[in-house]
Each structure stands twice: as C-alpha cells, then as structure tokens.
C-alpha cells in the first residue's frame, strides 16, 4: 500500500474566543489613538496607559525638546542647554504624575538645583523659567494629543452613524 498525501482541510486548534464587550466598546478609542503621530501616541500610552517602553520615552523627550526649543530664547549657553536636556525626562515624569494624582507635590527648586549641581540662586536666575517652560511644553503635548484623539474618535462615530 502506498501512502497518499492529503492536506488537512481544517485546523485542530480551537477557534479564537470572541471579543469581550469591553474590548469591542474600547476598539474605536484604540483606533483613534493609533491614528495619531508617534509622539502623541507615545505620550498617551505612557501617561494614561502606563506603557514604559523606551521607544515611547525617547519619542516623548524628542517631541518635548523640539517644542520647548522652538519657544525658548535662542541665546542660551551651551552648558545651560546641556543641563536642560537632562531635565526633559524629569519634566515629562512630573507632568504625568500631576495628571494622575491630585496629591502630587512639585519638586522644590533646591532639589532640582542639587540634581543639576548648581546653587539655588543659579537655579532661580537661570533654570527655573526653563523648567516652567519645559513643563508647559509637556502640558501642550498632552492637550494636543487628547484633543486629536477626541477629534478622531468623533469623526469615527460620525462615519459609523451616517
């Protein structure tokens, strides 16, 4: 008897379980977030989704720095810029924590001065306004990302309901 090759016509694996009601209801929001640019997606996933992926962290820092650099004075010393770069991720963390918790307390200027290895007076004269501006850049990213998500979501609802 010669063996005959026959291809299986069905898979022996179990079928995938159907989507839960929550996943189904949540999918339009997920599509809205996925339609954003990389930095906005990264911010929403980090701040509101708890995703700590390094690629998200770098995308957020690059977006915040470019937004901040566009609004900061052009005549900033190279040494100051180098120290400011070290504050970008800290400003992201501070704004994210403030968004999540009402009891969040801002870091004191003396603490931030110690992190940069500068005196408190130097912090107040040189770095404090930059710190405020950097946090404003993060808040602007937050607002733009949330509004863009809402806009995409509403457009999706309009398309579905029409």
Spans of features found by a protein language model:
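N-terminal interaction/assembly modules
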Residues: 1-42, 46-76, 105-122, 128-162
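Short, amphipathic alpha-helical "recognition" segments used to contact nucleic acids or chromatin
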Residues: 45-46, 53-54, 78-107
